[in-house]
């Protein structure tokens, strides 16, 4: 498969000073507005995981849902949703974490995974790693393991990918940006 990181990067819109001054937000919605780019992103992930040994797709609220749901369908895997606090209706497990903007809680239905399950976690971007680390902790609390954490974008200067690697969780991203890239 041919993958061009430049094409992907050119369709990720930088939004300066959002959600707060000094932050450059990486907006992936232009990728989803281009059928060719969307197919390239999803096919790249599907190609990586089609023969991998894992049982579930884990998708992070909210943009990770866009990736995870398509891949769960393509790869015929159960989808586990990791939601912001108060969004799930049944019994949940919760995990607190720090974000680049403050503190939050991540929740998952307590019956989503069983001992021995293996999860590929998806989000749109890895910044500090807070969301994915919280999800990994929830996965492990249910007796399952993390196969890999994946995202479209890595912001390596914020250290999230390294934090995940330090926990024994491999990471995979389609592209990366320096914090000052516009």
Swiss-Prot record:
PROSITE patterns: PUR_PYR_PR_TRANSFER. Its EC number is 2.4.2.7. SUPFAM superfamilies: PRTase-like. GO terms for cellular component: cytoplasm. Gene3D superfamilies: 3.40.50.2020. It holds the Pfam family Pribosyltran. One of its GO terms (molecular function) is adenine phosphoribosyltransferase activity. It is found in: Cytoplasm. Keywords: Cytoplasm, Glycosyltransferase, Purine salvage, Transferase. It catalyses: AMP + diphosphate = 5-phospho-alpha-D-ribose 1-diphosphate + adenine. One of its GO terms (biological process) is AMP salvage. Pathway: Purine metabolism; AMP biosynthesis via salvage pathway; AMP from adenine: step 1/1. NCBIfam families: apt (TIGR01090), PRK02304.1-3 (NF002634), PRK02304.1-5 (NF002636). Belongs to the purine/pyrimidine phosphoribosyltransferase family. This is Adenine phosphoribosyltransferase. It comes from Pseudomonas fluorescens (strain Pf0-1).
